[in-house]
Structure formats: C-alpha cells, structure tokens
C-alpha cells in the first residue's frame, strides 16, 4: 500500500484540510537509517508535518526543509519534503531509545520532549525564486504537532490545528501520518466555524488511535474527526497525490561536491586512498569514486 496526501476544503471553502499517510515512507527511513522505535516515531512525525507544510506551496517544485537544533540526545533532525510528495530525512542519533512516559490520557508514549531537549524548530520554504524563506520558533514539546502549530501561528499568522502520530508495535511500524486544519481568510470572521473547529480538535484524545483505525483512508479520517463541517461527506472537495520516500542525491551531485573541495584536497585523496567514498546523509546511499574519476575532476 502506498502513502498518499489529500487536500480538501470544507465548510463551503472556509476550512482547508490536509491529511497525509507516511507509513511506508517511515518504514523505508527506518530501514535506511537503522532507526530505533523512538527515532522512527520522530522521523515519521516530522516527515508528515513537512509534507503538510509543503502541500501549500504554489509551485510543484517547491520544497520545505524542517530542522530541529537542540540540546537533547536526539542530536538534531533534518527533513526535506516536496510539493510533489517526495520526502527524505535523518536524525543525529538514529539509535536513541528512551523510557516511555504516561501522557494526559494515561497512555504510554514516547518521551519526545526529553529526546529533543531545549532548542529551536527551523522551517525553510523554497519556491525556487530568490532566497528561501527562513523561520525559527522555540520548540514546544518536541512532539512535532504543537511545534508546527506554533510556527504557523507566529511565523505565518495562521491559526492552525496540526496532528501527527503513529502506531508502532514489536513487529514494527503499523501506521504513521498527520492532519492539518486551517481557517481560510474568507472565514476568519466566522466565529461559529472557528469555535466548531476548536471544539472538534479538543475532542481528539489520541490522533494515533484514529489514524490506526482508518489506515490509509484519509477522507474517512477527515470525516471521522470533523463530521459536522458539511452536511454530507460529498461536500468535502478533495484531491489526492502519492507520497514516497525519495532522495535527490545522485552520482553527478556527488562528483560536483568533490570538485568543490579543490585541487589540493583531491590530490591528497588520490595520494592517500586512491579513491573517495561519499555517503548521502538523507538516504545512506554510498557513492564510490575511483582514482581516474578523481583525476578527471582536477583536469
């Protein structure tokens, strides 16, 4: 089953809803980076959030980079997501595992706050025109959802509800995904609609349980959470696209990166090793560059 993203409008166009499933993408990230249960959850949540943000980019080649820099044992996180549904990412310490903690609902959950520690969430939007737009906010709790909502409120002045979650058991990743709900400008003074949206969001005790219940049926997930935004499910207008873990690295890019090192550094590689080996941080692909290729980079 492939991952997907659904964009929808409801309440006669007054609310923007985006839902995404990242189960398979998270599984691939786990395999490529040998992620622990904890870091699988964090990466899955961050990939979901990044795709939700990228979904609003106006150009198909637009991209969003989400980065956490903090003092926690996670040692940072970087996710790159595209409007086209591609996503990739990595964490500083992929093997990190911490004791579970009880949440407000008395359920055991991952200790995201301890993992990330105190620090910042950086969001970079790049539409390919001029300099990318950078925003930074303080981390709220490291669980990604509230952190992204804080970013949207303070950096984009857009009141939003952001939910991310996952279900992981001893057999691995069962599900991973997210949901974004925003009041659009045409309805920003419709206080009854705003109150309704807030009430529905407050009723969500465990987004992860809802996600597990609905699987990849994202429209059904939206209808389960917001049953009274419209008179009937058909009033929700939606479009869907495929989501996948996809890295933009290539042999050509690796050679270009080596060339930037300069003649002296390349000659040192040739003399000491007779080759170069480059590993992509995002996907762990390894590119072996032989001596004759290094020589050609100098010429």
Curated annotation (Swiss-Prot):
GO terms for cellular component: cytoplasm. The keyword Zinc applies. Pfam families: HSP33. InterPro entries: Heat_shock_Hsp33, Heat_shock_Hsp33_C, Heat_shock_Hsp33_N. One of its GO terms (biological process) is protein refolding. It comes from the Bacteria. The keyword Chaperone applies. GO terms for molecular function: protein folding chaperone; unfolded protein binding. Keywords: Chaperone, Cytoplasm, Disulfide bond, Redox-active center, Zinc. Disulfide bonds join 247-249, 280-283. It is found in: Cytoplasm. Under oxidizing conditions two disulfide bonds are formed involving the reactive cysteines. Under reducing conditions zinc is bound to the reactive cysteines and the protein is inactive. Redox regulated molecular chaperone. Protects both thermally unfolding and oxidatively damaged proteins from irreversible aggregation. Plays an important role in the bacterial defense system toward oxidative stress. Belongs to the HSP33 family. This is 33 kDa chaperonin. It comes from Prochlorococcus marinus (strain NATL1A). The gene is hslO.
